[in-house]
């Protein structure tokens, strides 16, 4: 069976594609590192490539050439050849790296100012050390700096350099003001070209040379541009040189508050309609930044006012004490005086009683004598005093009645008084509601407005420009109460009758009556007279009346003005005679 199979395979032709050289599809290719056994290394001829410098002891004759030879480090100082790690310092190659080569000065110190000088020219002055902060006069190497006067050549060179720099600035400023899109501003100079024509169409004759003048074509300055030029954005400028500062200090709360800038808030515009708090609005106003200085005169003025007030209060207190002492002293003197008057009055009363008793005894003895006593009718002064008191009483009664009538005077009576007074103002009539305007249509306008002949043009009543009275108050004046002429003033019954008649008439219904009065006014007791007030008296304690009673009275008490009839005041002699 095996021999049959082998014979069958041998009889078949050799396959054209064995699959060894065919490319494996992408999805079937192995991924990741290829693992090769130790027995397959020699068959596959794999070469291991090493990067970086060889280890120490194996560097004899080795020279770093590529960037991989340096690894992650720099140049090798033991190899005395030109080395360019990261292609730094190599001329003719454009580097894109921002790394700087470490440079040292004569003393072997690293020159850190190379970072600040990067991107600037060699003539640029860059201050990058502490020595640059010290003034020239205070430096240690002051003697090394040359302060000699420059030569003429140096002055001329510097002046020419300055002049060129200023000229370039001026030209740039002038060119910036000139229009850039105006064509035909400057025309180039014409160009002359020598032209020798070639042989054409088999013509072998000699041709003369021609000199051609090439002139730039005239352009229309008002022609719009044909192409749109787009400016390329400018690249970032060179970094500015570092500025040396003092070491940073931690800000205090006062410094932070001083550097806090409030947001600007306008007092006039608020297009968004925000509700800004009042403290934020005041903070943006800047009032807190101003130092408020209060004049010391305010404190002095307040202190002066306080002192003056205290002094015035002290004076008032002392004055009140003095017045109280004076009042007490005066009261004591008055009591002493009253006591003396009372003692004197008692003594006089006792003396008068003794004198009356003696006179009474003498009269009784005289009446018993046979001689008749003829009584003389002498005019008495008491009758005159009685008539005078009656007249005063009558006048007072008339004044009281007049005041009563005036207090109960109605509106009509007041109009009568106003009519009697010629110079009375019309505003009082208007306030009383009695100056009623006329309701006729003729008095509603002025006749002069209608070109009537009764106006001022006719010459009638030139002093009075109005033809009708302003108010017609004659009806109210005619209804005024007028007392009768034959009424006697002293007639009390007639006066009382007229008073009762006036009281019964409803004189206030003419002007209208209030619908509702004050609360509690209906329950009040009706008043039969005018409102009476207590009059202020100069002698509230009755001391003066007491003195008058003591000094003027004969021991009898009288209240008010009391009339004593003449019959009751007869002398005791007459009563004795009657008996």
Curated annotation (Swiss-Prot):
<feature type="region of interest" description="Disordered">
    <location>
        <begin position="1"/>
        <end position="64"/>
    </location>
</feature>
<dbReference type="GO" id="GO:0000974">
    <property type="term" value="C:Prp19 complex"/>
</dbReference>
<dbReference type="InterPro" id="IPR004015">
    <property type="entry name" value="SKI-int_prot_SKIP_SNW-dom"/>
</dbReference>
<comment type="subunit">
    <text>Associated with the spliceosome.</text>
</comment>
<feature type="region of interest" description="Disordered">
    <location>
        <begin position="343"/>
        <end position="414"/>
    </location>
</feature>
<dbReference type="GO" id="GO:0000398">
    <property type="term" value="P:mRNA splicing, via spliceosome"/>
</dbReference>
<comment type="similarity">
    <text>Belongs to the SNW family.</text>
</comment>
<feature type="compositionally biased region" description="Basic and acidic residues">
    <location>
        <begin position="563"/>
        <end position="579"/>
    </location>
</feature>
<feature type="region of interest" description="Disordered">
    <location>
        <begin position="521"/>
        <end position="579"/>
    </location>
</feature>
<dbReference type="InterPro" id="IPR017862">
    <property type="entry name" value="SKI-int_prot_SKIP"/>
</dbReference>
<dbReference type="Pfam" id="PF02731">
    <property type="entry name" value="SKIP_SNW"/>
</dbReference>
<keyword id="KW-0508">mRNA splicing</keyword>
<keyword id="KW-0747">Spliceosome</keyword>
<feature type="compositionally biased region" description="Basic and acidic residues">
    <location>
        <begin position="521"/>
        <end position="538"/>
    </location>
</feature>
<feature type="compositionally biased region" description="Low complexity">
    <location>
        <begin position="366"/>
        <end position="379"/>
    </location>
</feature>
<keyword id="KW-0507">mRNA processing</keyword>
<protein>
    <recommendedName>
        <fullName>Pre-mRNA-processing protein 45</fullName>
    </recommendedName>
</protein>
<feature type="compositionally biased region" description="Pro residues">
    <location>
        <begin position="234"/>
        <end position="245"/>
    </location>
</feature>
<dbReference type="GO" id="GO:0060090">
    <property type="term" value="F:molecular adaptor activity"/>
</dbReference>
<feature type="region of interest" description="Disordered">
    <location>
        <begin position="218"/>
        <end position="254"/>
    </location>
</feature>
<dbReference type="GO" id="GO:0003723">
    <property type="term" value="F:RNA binding"/>
</dbReference>
<dbReference type="GO" id="GO:0071014">
    <property type="term" value="C:post-mRNA release spliceosomal complex"/>
</dbReference>
<feature type="compositionally biased region" description="Basic and acidic residues">
    <location>
        <begin position="343"/>
        <end position="359"/>
    </location>
</feature>
<feature type="compositionally biased region" description="Basic and acidic residues">
    <location>
        <begin position="386"/>
        <end position="414"/>
    </location>
</feature>
<keyword id="KW-0539">Nucleus</keyword>
<comment type="function">
    <text>Involved in pre-mRNA splicing.</text>
</comment>
């Amino acid at each position: 069976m095996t021999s049959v199979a082998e014979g069958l395979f041998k009889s078949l032709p050799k396959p054209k594609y064995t699959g060894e050289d065919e490319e494996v599809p992408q999805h079937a290719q192995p991924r990741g590192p290829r693992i090769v056994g130790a027995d397959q290394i020699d068959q596959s001829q794999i070469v291991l490539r090493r990067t970086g410098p060889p280890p120490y002891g194996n560097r004899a004759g080795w020279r770093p050439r590529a960037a991989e030879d340096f690894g992650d480090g720099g140049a090798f100082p033991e190899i005395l050849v030109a080395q360019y790690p990261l292609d730094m310092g190599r001329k003719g190659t454009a580097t894109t790296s921002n790394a700087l080569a470490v440079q040292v000065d004569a003393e072997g110190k690293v020159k850190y100012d190379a970072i600040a000088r990067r991107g600037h020219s060699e003539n640029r002055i860059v201050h990058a050390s502490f020595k640059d902060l010290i003034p020239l006069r205070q430096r240690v190497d002051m003697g090394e700096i040359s302060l000699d006067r420059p030569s003429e050549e140096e002055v001329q060179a510097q002046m020419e350099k300055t002049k060129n720099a200023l000229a370039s600035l001026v030209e740039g400023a002038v060119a910036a003001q000139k229009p850039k899109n105006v064509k035909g501003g400057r025309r180039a100079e014409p160009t002359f070209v020598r032209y020798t024509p070639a042989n054409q169409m088999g013509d072998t004759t000699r041709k003369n040379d021609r000199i051609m003048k090439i002139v730039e074509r005239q352009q229309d300055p008002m022609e719009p541009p044909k192409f749109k030029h787009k400016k390329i954005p400018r690249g970032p400028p060179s970094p500015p040189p570092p500025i040396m500062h003092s070491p940073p200090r931690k800000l205090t709360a006062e410094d932070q508050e001083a550097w806090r800038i409030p947001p600007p808030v306008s007092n006039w515009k608020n297009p968004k309609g925000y509700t800004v708090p009042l403290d934020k609005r005041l903070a943006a106003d800047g009032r807190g930044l101003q130092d408020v200085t209060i004049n010391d005169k305010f404190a002095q003025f307040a202190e002066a006012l306080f002192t003056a007030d205290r002094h015035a209060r002290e004076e008032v207190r002392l004055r009140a004490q003095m017045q109280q002492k004076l009042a007490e002293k005066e009261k004591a003197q008055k009591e002493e005086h009253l006591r003396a008057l009372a003692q004197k009055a008692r003594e006089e009363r006792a003396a008068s009683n003794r004198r009356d008793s003696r006179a009474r005894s003498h009269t009784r003895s005289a009446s018993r004598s046979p001689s008749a006593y003829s009584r003389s009718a002498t005019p008495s002064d008491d009758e005159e005093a009685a008539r005078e008191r009656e007249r005063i009483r009558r006048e007072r009664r008339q004044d009281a009645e007049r005041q009563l009538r005036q207090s109960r005077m109605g509106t009509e009576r007041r109009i009568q008084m106003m009519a009697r007074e010629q110079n009375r103002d019309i505003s009082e009539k208007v306030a009383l509601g009695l100056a009623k305007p006329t309701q006729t249509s003729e008095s509603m306008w002025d006749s002069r407005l209608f070109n009537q002949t009764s106006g001022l043009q006719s010459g009638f009543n030139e002093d009075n420009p109005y033809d009708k009275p302003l108010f017609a108050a004659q009806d109210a004046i005619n209804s005024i109460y007028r007392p009768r002429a034959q009424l006697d003033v002293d007639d009390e019954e007639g006066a009382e009758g007229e008073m009762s008649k006036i009281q019964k008439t409803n004189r206030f219904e003419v002007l209208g009556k209030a619908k509702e009065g004050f609360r509690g006014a209906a329950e009040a007791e009706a008043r039969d007279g005018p409102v009476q007030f207590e009059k202020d008296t100069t002698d509230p304690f009755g001391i003066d009346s007491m003195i008058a009673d003591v000094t003027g009275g004969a021991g009898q008490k009288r209240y008010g003005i009391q009339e004593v009839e003449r019959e009751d005041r007869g002398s005791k002699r007459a009563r004795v005679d009657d008996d």
